[in-house]
């Protein structure tokens, strides 16, 4: 089972067709990998604050 997205309305679903507009849903592409972590300092600060 893969996460899918409706190209027409943008709703995420697990079904082959969107439940709102009956458009065929497509497989979502994963975000592009980058070794530069833009949000790493914020994530580490939040983790440190929780400890």
From Swiss-Prot:
Q: Which SUPFAM superfamilies does this UniProt record tie to the protein? A: Nop10-like SnoRNP (SSF144210)
Does the record's keyword annotation contain Acetylation? no
Tell me if NAD is a UniProt keyword of this record: no
Record keywords, A-Z: Ribonucleoprotein, Ribosome biogenesis, rRNA processing
Gene Ontology terms: biological process: pseudouridine synthesis; rRNA processing
Of the GO CC terms on this record, one is: ribonucleoprotein complex
Q: Which residues cross the membrane?
A: none
GO molecular-function term, one example from the UniProt record? snoRNA binding
The organism's superkingdom is given as Archaea
The UniProt entry, under InterPro entries, shows: H/ACA_rnp_Nop10, H/ACA_rnp_Nop10_sf, Nop10_arc-typ
Protein family (similarity comment): Belongs to the NOP10 family.
What does it do? Involved in ribosome biogenesis; more specifically in 18S rRNA pseudouridylation and in cleavage of pre-rRNA.
Protein name listed in UniProt: Ribosome biogenesis protein Nop10
């Amino acid at each position: 089972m893969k996460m899918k997205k409706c190209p027409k309305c943008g709703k995420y679903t697990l079904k082959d067709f969107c439940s709102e507009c009956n458009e065929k849903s497509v497989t979502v592409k994963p975000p592009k990998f980058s070794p530069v972590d833009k949000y790493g300092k914020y994530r580490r600060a939040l983790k440190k604050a929780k400890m």
